[in-house]
A protein has these predicted regions:
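N-terminal catalytic or cofactor-binding beta/alpha core of small enzyme domains
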Residues: 1-151, 155-185
Length: 185
């Protein structure tokens, strides 16, 4: 399952933060090609689903995951173009993972566009983050995936949206295959 909680402007501690529109686009594109479930924040309610103590967005995500037996949630975010890393994967030092298949599948993919960091800067460890809250409440693997904006926005020469989409598509397909191989009756 894919999550894009910052698809619209959001308010964190009284400060309006810009929308991460490309994460919504990415989630929609992956839904179209893979038919995987998505949740995308489409209306600004002066809130931040990845920060506020109470969040209807997180509640809806947890409810969906529980009712539909989702195995993994990728929580998509955009990283500032000023950062060096191409990706930062937040797992709360592995606490948000229920298996080791998910992280190894993600980290195995070499995009050839920049560094992939794990649990540096954005660990997704705060109790009100989408990843930590969903992992705990729904007992599911959940990874916060921070993608550098310079690879998602056409304004940058490093633009590589199609490669990122294709890599995530390949990763999701691989995870589905791995989980199917590990189902026991």
């Amino acid at each position: 399952m894919l999550s894009a909680p910052h698809g619209v402007e959001h308010t964190r501690a009284g400060r309006v933060k810009p929308a991460e529109v490309q994460t919504s686009d990415l989630a929609r594109d992956l839904h179209r090609s893979l038919h995987c479930p998505v949740i995308i924040k489409t209306k600004s309610n002066d809130d931040d689903p990845n920060y506020d103590e109470h969040s209807p967005y997180r509640d809806a995500l947890v409810d969906y995951v529980k009712k539909n037996d989702a195995r993994v949630v990728f929580d998509l975010h955009q990283l500032s173009s000023e950062r060096e890393a191409a990706f930062i994967l937040g797992t709360a030092d592995g606490k948000n993972l229920r298996d080791d298949i998910t992280l190894s599948t993600l980290c195995r993919k070499d995009l050839g566009i920049g560094a992939v960091l794990v649990d540096e800067v954005f660990k997704a460890s705060g109790p009100n983050t989408v990843a930590a809250s969903t992992a705990k409440r729904a007992d599911v693997s959940c990874i916060q995936i921070e993608i550098n904006s310079k690879y998602l926005c056409k304004d940058f020469p490093e633009y590589a949206y199609d490669r990122i989409r294709d890599a995530l598509e390949e990763c999701i397909t691989s995870l589905n295959s791995n989980f199917a191989d590990h189902v026991y009756d």
